[in-house]
Amino acid sequence: SWKEQEVSEAFNQYNDMLENILGYEVILDMVRNDKTITKILDFGCGKSYLTFAMYYYLHELKGLTLEVTGLDLKKDVIVHCNELAKKYHYEGLSFLHGDIADYTGTDSADMVVTLHACDTATDYALYKAMKWHAGVILSVPCCQHEVNKQIACEPLEGALKYGLIKERLSALFTDALRADLLEENGYDTQVLEFIDMEHTPKNILLRAVRRVDAGMADEQSGLTEAEQKSGQCCKEPDSKRLAETLQIHTTLQKLLEGELV
C-alpha cells in the first residue's frame, strides 16, 4: 500500500534530516512540556513527501497529536495530497492551495517549515513564523533574486562584476541577513549545510529555535527586550550594518519594519 511503501520510503529518505539535521527532538521536548496539540505549517510543501514523513514520524512513531497543514501554489498537487491524507485516515494532516504571502489561516504555530520557497516567499514565511512566535523554524531558501538586483558595495566591486559570483554572493548575503534578523527577533539560529533527496545541489538550512526569554525585536533598536536589558542596545544590530554595507533593503526587513502588510 502507499502507506507502507511510499510514506515508509519517504521516511527512510528523510530519516537523517528528520532526526538529526532538523532536530525534531527540540519540538518533541516542547510538546512533552506542554500537552497541547502541536500545530505545524509547511509552506511550499510541493509533492509533500516531507510533510507526510513529518506526520508519520511525529504522529505514528512518536504518538503526538498533530495539526499539520501544507500550503502550495500547485492546485493539482494539493488535491492529490488531500486525497492521500483522507485515504489513509491522517485526520490531522491537511493541504491548502494558496500563496504564502496571503495565508491567514492561523494566528499561531508551534513549528514552521519552508523548503525551497522561491525568493521573497521565504521572507513571508519567516515573518509569519516570527509573528506567531513559532518555537521552531526550519527554512531552506532558494532563488534569492532580490538582493542580486540591489547589492552595491565598492570594496566588493572586483567580485560583483562577475555575474555568477554576484549571484552566489547575493544568495549567501540574503541568508546571512535572514539569520541575523531571526537572532535579533528572539531565535537561536544555526546556518547548516543541507542536501535533500529531490535536489542534489547543496543548500543552506536555517534552523531557528525560539529562546525562552524571546520577544519580537524593538521597532527602533532591532533588539529583543532581554538584549536591551543586558546593555546591548548601544550596539547597532548586525542586520542593519550588513544591509547598509551592501546597500540592500529586503522584503523581510520591510515586513519587520511594518512597511509591507
Spell out what each predicted region is.
Residues 36-46:
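Conserved class I S-adenosyl-L-methionine
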Residues 47-63:
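Conserved SAM-binding loop of SAM-dependent methyltransferases across substrates and taxa
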Residues 66-69:
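Short beta-strand element of Class I
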Residues 1-22, 39, 71-261:
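Class I S-adenosyl-L-methionine
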Residues 21-34, 60:
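Glycine-rich helix-loop-beta junction characteristic of Rossmann-like nucleotide cofactor-binding loops
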